[in-house]
């Protein structure tokens, strides 16, 4: 553990002692490395040679400076992973959970099996970078995985109380307009310099689907929140379940469409996969989802616009925090550009839903 930061090394020592007490493994650990990603949550991969052979594990806990909800979010993730154990949804298998904060002093944590794959948000291996046919299938595999998640009976897998689906769609516009308004509390933030906020909100209210079938939602379903096979296009795991809940699973498909490559437009999120070409079109993604789902996709444009609206407001929060000195200015500026592009895309989809143009 020498190459880890001292606090993480101390955490790992406590975790391995806990594993021994729980009968989860004995002996020294090796091949230790921190896994970095788009989240502040801490993940450390390590291996252990025990009496039953070699085992590799991943430790996941909240960030160094825990927020009030950090432990709750981590434990919610474990509920989802446990619920998915006997489904065909690609995910990292859960091994063990520690809800006792005294083990680490402040944080709950869990152990999962590692997934052999790569995150497209961190770059593409040679195979995927060089073969457009592989990249084309990557998006279709993402649509497959989203459809499988949306098809899970959340009540049957123990998640009946995991969210509040009643009134879920009605809550979205006021919830996120309220979030945008809350940014005014940040010093030196002049307000959102984003076109179309009111127009998009009004359109969403007027075109809201009349009903939906509740299910498990990932909540942040884009190409950097899945792991792809290193040897092909398949999604081997959906990761980062921090925003998961019970709601309308079609929001995950909408989120994917909102953040996907669009011909002639700048990428919404910085991601190499979105810039190299050869990707499936939005219509192909919808068609593949439909092949694996019984859900009504006739209003999928609404879900894509909602995703643009919601994600745009979330990203603008970094601009507001940057204005107050609570986030790096360069990050705030980059994410503000993404927010503007998302609202531009929302208005293009709104026009296209009437004229048959761009999604």
Predicted regions and their residues:
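Juxta-kinase regulatory segment immediately upstream of eukaryotic protein kinase catalytic domains
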Residues: 1-25
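ATP-binding pocket architecture of kinase catalytic cores
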Residues: 32-216, 230-232
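All-alpha amphipathic helical-bundle segments outside canonical DNA-binding/catalytic cores
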Residues: 164, 295-307
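Catalytic-loop of the protein kinase fold
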Residues: 216-218, 223
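Hydrophobic residue at the +6 position relative to the catalytic HRD Asp in the kinase catalytic loop
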Residues: 226-228
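Activation of the activation-loop gatekeeper triad in protein kinase-fold domains
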Residues: 239-244
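Active-site activation/catalytic loop segments of kinase-like enzymes and analogous catalytic loops
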Residues: 251-293, 307-326
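Helical subdomain adjoining the active site within ATP-dependent kinase catalytic cores
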Residues: 295, 299, 313-359
């Amino acid at each position: 553990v020498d190459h880890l930061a001292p606090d993480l090394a101390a955490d790992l020592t406590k975790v391995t002692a806990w594993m021994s007490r729980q009968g989860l493994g004995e002996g020294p650990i090796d091949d230790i490395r921190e896994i970095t990603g788009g989240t502040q949550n801490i993940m450390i991969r390590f291996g252990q040679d025990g009496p039953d052979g070699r085992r590799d594990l991943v430790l996941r806990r909240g960030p160094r400076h825990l927020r009030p909800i950090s432990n709750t979010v981590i434990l919610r993730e474990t509920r989802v992973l446990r619920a998915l154990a006997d489904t065909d949804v690609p995910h990292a298998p859960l091994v063990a959970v520690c809800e006792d904060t005294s083990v680490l002093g402040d944080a709950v944590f869990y152990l999962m099996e590692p997934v052999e794959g790569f995150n497209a948000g961190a770059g593409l291996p040679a195979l995927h970078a060089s073969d457009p046919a592989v990249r084309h299938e990557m998006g279709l595999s993402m649509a497959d995985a989203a459809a499988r998640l949306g098809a899970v009976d959340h009540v049957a897998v123990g998640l009946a109380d995991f969210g509040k689906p009643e009134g879920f769609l009605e809550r979205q516009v006021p919830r996120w307009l309220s979030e945008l308004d809350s940014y005014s509390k940040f010093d030196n933030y002049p307000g959102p310099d984003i076109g179309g906020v009111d127009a998009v909100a009004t359109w969403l209210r007027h075109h809201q689907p009349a009903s939906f079938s509740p299910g498990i939602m990932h909540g942040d379903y884009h190409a950097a929140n899945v792991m792809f096979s290193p040897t092909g296009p398949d999604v081997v795991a959906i990761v980062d379940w921090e925003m998961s809940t019970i709601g309308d699973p079609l929001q995950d498909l909408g989120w994917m469409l909102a953040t996907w490559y669009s011909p002639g437009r700048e990428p919404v999120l910085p991601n190499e996969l979105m810039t190299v070409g050869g990707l499936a079109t939005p219509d192909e993604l919808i068609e593949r989802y439909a092949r694996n789902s019984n859900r009504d996709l006739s209003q999928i444009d609404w879900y894509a616009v909602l995703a643009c609206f919601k994600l745009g407001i979330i990203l603008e929060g970094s601009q507001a925090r940057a204005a107050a000195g609570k986030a790096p200015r360069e990050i705030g500026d980059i994410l503000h550009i993404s927010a503007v592009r998302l609202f531009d895309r929302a208005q293009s989809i709104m026009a296209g839903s009437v004229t048959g143009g761009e999604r």
